[in-house]
């Protein structure tokens, strides 16, 4: 008997239950992913059709580190800190400031941790001196030599006002619209040797050359008179001098055309054969004056890069030390139509520029203006800055009885010679000092906050306890003297031999 399957009806839900509609489906956010769509069909090329190859942009020249240029940045680390301290000090009446007020400028000095400011000031005895006025009142001021340097700097900048006006005119003549924001010019204030108050003095005294106009983003400086005699770049002047020198030397050499293009590279620059070929091809291009109209040049073209290199070359020629920060040049992208990769463009032309990565921000040097870390031609302001650097290098505790090395002897002799003549310096308040903590640690002997006894020195503006002038250096010298004395006594004495009480020698274990 076949078994029959009985299908029973499913019991209906009770009448009291309510049917709810199903919840809406959530939106699938991956619907637009390219992996979900089928790839386009491959199109076969016709026989003989040209194939398009992908071109990968690469830097023309690889950057190479050069120690002489990096040493220029390294030796100015302490000088930049001292100049920041000096700028804060000279903003006060009579150029005298209390240590309590100086504690409010820790962030401006790049000090994120608490340091003994008095110990920092005493590390530069040639620049600052700490004096006590009243009970628990400590103030600091410039030394007579540093005071004389500062006054000489102000006097020299006032005398060279005509040269500063010429630099501003040449800078405006190179711009596209012949106008530049004053805020952008302020970034190059120290590099060009402009006085601190140039906005209220130079910009308003010479309406026959330029005037202050209101722009979309603030006041700007606009050119009012074009002088064709100023529209000659430093590269053109150098080319004329080289051509005249070659004319004089041609009488000693057989006058015949060269069979190959000769590339003259600066001393110390080493390039591969391919890099030298690209540098030679760029040099063979016609020179484009930075003062010519460049509105028709297409961005990204070789002609535009030739013009941009000429503009950077001319700006660096106008600076005092023939160098500046790369960030300062990037502020003028709109005025000179610089490319977004300005740093890469400078690296691609090592025969003209050198980009140093030392410090917190990159610096660019005009290569032809330097020889072994030294400027070929130094202005009076640069000489005053070197005298200030000699003051910064004056040691706090000169070593006695120890023959100085040749480097220390040269530095000491140079400092003595420079101090006898008087001096000055240009400040550099725009340059980055985020690595100032490392410099302070080096100056203060690597001591952190916990290494100091905060009850003996200034901690902040609310600390009323007097500082201790006898810092760690004095105690360390005393310990060294005691140790040397003990060592000398032990060396002069006889060796101790173990004996019995009656004087008989005892065997050693």
From Swiss-Prot:
Keywords: Chloroplast, mRNA processing, mRNA splicing, Plastid, RNA-binding, Transit peptide. Coiled coil: none annotated. Residues 461-474 have a biased composition (Acidic residues). It is found in: Plastid, Chloroplast. It comes from the Eukaryota. GO terms for molecular function: mRNA binding. This is Protein WHAT'S THIS FACTOR 1 homolog, chloroplastic. Residues 402-431, 444-509 are annotated as: Disordered. GO terms for cellular component: chloroplast. The keyword S-adenosyl-L-methionine does not apply. Residues 65-393 form the PORR domain. Pfam families: PORR. One of its GO terms (biological process) is mRNA processing. Residues 1-56 form a transit peptide. RNA-binding protein involved in group II intron splicing. Binds specific group II introns and promotes their splicing. Functions in the context of a heterodimer with the ribonuclease III domain-containing protein RNC1.
């Amino acid at each position: 008997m076949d078994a029959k399957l009985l299908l029973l009806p499913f019991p209906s839900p009770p009448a009291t239950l309510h049917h709810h509609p199903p919840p809406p489906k959530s939106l699938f956010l991956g619907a637009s992913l390219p992996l979900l769509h089928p790839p386009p069909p491959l199109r076969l090329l016709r026989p003989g059709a040209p194939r398009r190859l992908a071109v990968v942009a690469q830097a023309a020249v690889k950057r190479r580190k050069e120690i002489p240029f990096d040493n220029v940045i390294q030796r100015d680390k302490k000088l930049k800190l001292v100049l920041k301290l000096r700028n804060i000090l000279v903003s006060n009446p009579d150029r005298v400031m209390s240590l309590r007020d100086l504690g409010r400028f820790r962030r401006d000095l790049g000090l994120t941790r608490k340091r003994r400011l008095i110990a920092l000031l005493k590390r530069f005895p040639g620049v600052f001196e700490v004096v006590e006025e009243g009970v628990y009142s400590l103030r600091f001021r410039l030394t007579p030599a540093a005071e004389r340097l500062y006054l000489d700097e102000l006097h020299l900048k006032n005398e060279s006002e005509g040269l500063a006006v010429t630099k501003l005119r040449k800078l405006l003549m190179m711009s596209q619209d012949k106008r530049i924001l004053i805020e952008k010019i302020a970034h190059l204030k120290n590099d060009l040797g402009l006085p601190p108050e140039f906005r209220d003095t130079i910009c308003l005294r010479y309406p026959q050359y330029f005037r202050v106009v209101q722009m979309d983003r603030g006041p700007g400086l606009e050119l009012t008179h074009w002088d064709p005699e100023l529209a000659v770049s430093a590269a053109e002047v150098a080319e004329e001098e080289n051509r005249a020198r070659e004319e004089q030397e041609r009488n000693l050499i057989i006058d015949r055309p060269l069979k190959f293009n000769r590339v003259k590279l600066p001393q110390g620059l080493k390039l591969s054969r391919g890099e030298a070929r690209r540098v030679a091809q760029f040099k063979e291009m016609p020179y484009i004056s930075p003062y010519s109209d460049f509105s028709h040049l297409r961005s990204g073209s070789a002609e535009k890069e030739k013009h941009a290199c000429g503009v950077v070359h001319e700006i660096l020629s106008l600076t005092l030390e023939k160098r500046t920060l790369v960030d300062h040049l990037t502020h003028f992208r709109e005025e000179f139509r610089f490319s977004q990769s300005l740093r890469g463009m400078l690296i691609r032309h090592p025969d003209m520029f050198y980009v140093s990565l030392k410090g917190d921000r990159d610096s660019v040097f005009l290569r032809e203006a330097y020889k072994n870390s030294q400027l070929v031609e130094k202005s009076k302001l640069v000489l005053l800055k070197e005298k200030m650097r000699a003051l910064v290098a004056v040691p706090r505790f000169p070593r006695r009885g120890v023959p100085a090395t040749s480097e220390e002897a040269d530095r000491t002799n140079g400092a003595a010679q420079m101090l006898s003549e008087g001096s000055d310096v240009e400040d550099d308040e725009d340059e980055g000092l985020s690595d100032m903590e490392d410099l302070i640690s080096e100056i203060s002997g690597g001591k952190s906050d916990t290494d100091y006894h905060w009850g003996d020195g200034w901690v902040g503006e609310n600390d009323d306890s007097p500082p201790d002038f006898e810092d760690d250096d004095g105690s360390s010298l005393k310990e060294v003297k005691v140790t040397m004395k003990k060592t000398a006594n032990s060396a002069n004495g006889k060796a101790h031999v173990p004996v019995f009480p009656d004087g008989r020698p005892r065997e050693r274990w």
